Amino acid sequence: MSADKVTLADLPLRDNLRGKSPYGAPQLQVPVRLNTNENPHPPSKALVDDVAASVREAAAELHRYPDRDAVALRTDLAAYLTAATGVRLGVENLWAANGSNEILQQLLQAFGGPGRTAIGFVPSYSMHPIISDGTQTEWLQASRAEDFGLDIDVAVSAVTERKPDVVFVTSPNNPSGQSVPLDDLRRVLDAMQGGILIVDEAYGEFSSQPSAVALLDDYPAKLVVSRTMSKAFAFAGGRLGYLAAAPAVIDALLLVRLPYHLSVLTQAAARAALRHADDTLGSVKALIAERERVSAELTRMGYRVIPSDANFVLFGAFTDAPATWQRYLDAGVLIRDVGIPGHLRVTIGLAAENDAFLAAGAELAGTELQPSTSPVGAQ
């Protein structure tokens, strides 16, 4: 049998991976790309120059392994998160990896695995079940409210009855955008009988709610807060995620992480990006203002708009969401079909990109919407 004739069915793939689909946000060259929730504002010249100089300096050490524990980077992350949340954190509370997905993978390697379970409240981030499958952690799920927000009573009941080893709560939730109040997170934590709660705050810088980091001292053995530099930080190409937790959690991850997992170049570039945090995060207010403008315009056109606390908006209600996604693409606008019947998600871009999206939406509103569509939260 020639190599090009071999299929997955011919390979000794694990049974729990057969029939599954990989993560796949389309990467297409179109005029307007609003599908992966990146910060559309490019890095400043000062940041680019700092990254280039830092990487150049680090390159002189390419013949040596990097700092295995990334102490300097974690120290900088602790300083940033302390300033951002008002919660005093040290290097012992922070861990970093190649994007928050690697953070989540390491957490599941340490606290999930064969014979253990993880639960999420769907629809939510699609990588949570994929990472669970990859670590042979049984994936459980419970439903969200009609507006896709977290139904705290359902969540507490699910955690109490099913006793998962890992609980995922995304705040703000992707793809619906709602943040979870700290009091609701406390209810979930209080209901847990062992296990850990991972609060996924990938979009935390956009949120109107306080970070779950504020609860770490009260629940040191139960709570982990994961974050990323891929969204508000405009560092998606740099691939840097991190978490805040009790020092013992970091000790647990040391048992499963691969040695030297963060390259010397990644560490240098991320530290440079953190030095420009104030400048980069200055775009957050502008993106929030654009989010509100886009939401208001979609509502005016008759779309059902889910109120968002992130840098994206979930909207509908379409007769055939996949077909409507294609019509946006035909108009030169790439948005995201996240698999929720009747709904699509759009990333908030630059004003001109949002205008192009809205222009396409105005054309489609008369033909694509369900007759019963009524905007959520409309006055």
Curated annotation (Swiss-Prot):
Pathway: Amino-acid biosynthesis; L-histidine biosynthesis; L-histidine from 5-phospho-alpha-D-ribose 1-diphosphate: step 7/9
GO biological process: L-histidine biosynthetic process
Residue positions where N6-(pyridoxal phosphate)lysine is found in the record: 231
GO molecular function, one term: histidinol-phosphate transaminase activity
Keyword annotations from UniProtKB, A to Z: Amino-acid biosynthesis, Aminotransferase, Histidine biosynthesis, Pyridoxal phosphate, Transferase
Cofactors required: pyridoxal 5'-phosphate
Domain of life the protein comes from: Bacteria
Name of the top EC class for this enzyme: transferase
Catalysed reaction, written as an equation: L-histidinol phosphate + 2-oxoglutarate = 3-(imidazol-4-yl)-2-oxopropyl phosphate + L-glutamate
E.C. number: 2.6.1.9
PROSITE patterns (alphabetical): AA_TRANSFER_CLASS_2 (PS00599)
Complexes and interactors: Homodimer.
Sequence similarity: Belongs to the class-II pyridoxal-phosphate-dependent aminotransferase family. Histidinol-phosphate aminotransferase subfamily.
Name used for this protein in its record: Histidinol-phosphate aminotransferase
Organism the protein comes from: Mycolicibacterium smegmatis (strain ATCC 700084 / mc(2)155) (Mycobacterium smegmatis)
Organismal lineage: Bacteria, Bacillati, Actinomycetota, Actinomycetes, Mycobacteriales
